[in-house]
Regions:
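Short, flexible, surface-exposed loop segments at domain boundaries
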Residues: 3-5, 11, 15, 20-67, ...
Length: 192
């Protein structure tokens, strides 16, 4: 014989499960570092590499940036300050089509900035302020690096690296730019 409390509990559990399934999700992240907010057609926060302009293209979505606040390393900026390969956080809206949106904020902050300590051309790696940086064929290099590859850098060069941090702690570079010798140094990480 089933007690009323048990039956009510099962119905409540079933009801909650149906409601959760009906919501359809929309949040979460994927392996490429994409972080999404609410659902398509709603307010979103997305993080990813810039893949193009004509506004800003991130994670397959074309965000119109007219009127958006753009911030680079905590300083005001403009769309012309942004570069392909930089990992940015975008706050705004995505249209129902899932490929168009409007950004209200575009925020860039590098992963590490400082002098190159070592370069391993064979493994496409370098070390900046103790952080290992992995380069790939997808990494974009700035105009001041010639050739536009790891070979265009030397120990002692000051660089800015944008990318994603792997679970191993290695920075997977999406963009590397040479900076002036007097530029600031910056490193992010977990305090042990």
């Amino acid at each position: 014989m089933m007690h009323a409390d048990t039956a009510l509990g099962r119905w409540m559990t079933f009801g909650v499960a149906i409601l959760v399934a009906a919501c359809g999700g929309g949040g979460g992240s994927s392996s490429d570092g994409v972080t999404a907010g609410i659902d398509r057609g709603g307010i979103v926060t997305a993080t990813g590499s810039i893949t193009g302009f004509g506004s800003v293209h991130v994670n397959g979505v074309h965000y119109v940036t007219t009127g958006a606040t753009i911030t680079l390393d905590d300083n005001p900026g403009t769309e012309s300050d942004l570069r392909v390969g930089q990992v940015v956080r975008i706050e705004g809206r995505i249209e129902q089509d899932g490929v168009n949106g409007t950004a209200t904020r575009v925020i860039f902050d590098d992963e590490v900035e400082g002098p190159v300590q070592s370069i391993d051309l064979g493994n496409l790696r370098l070390v900046v302020l103790g952080r290992t940086v992995q380069v790939s064929t997808q990494t974009s290099f700035g105009d001041r690096i010639s050739p536009r590859s790891l070979e265009g850098l030397a120990v002692g060069d000051r660089i800015e690296v944008s990318g994603r941090v792997a679970t191993t702690g290695v920075v997977e570079a999406t963009r590397i730019e040479r900076k002036n010798a007097q530029s600031s140094v910056e490193v992010k990480g977990t305090i042990a």
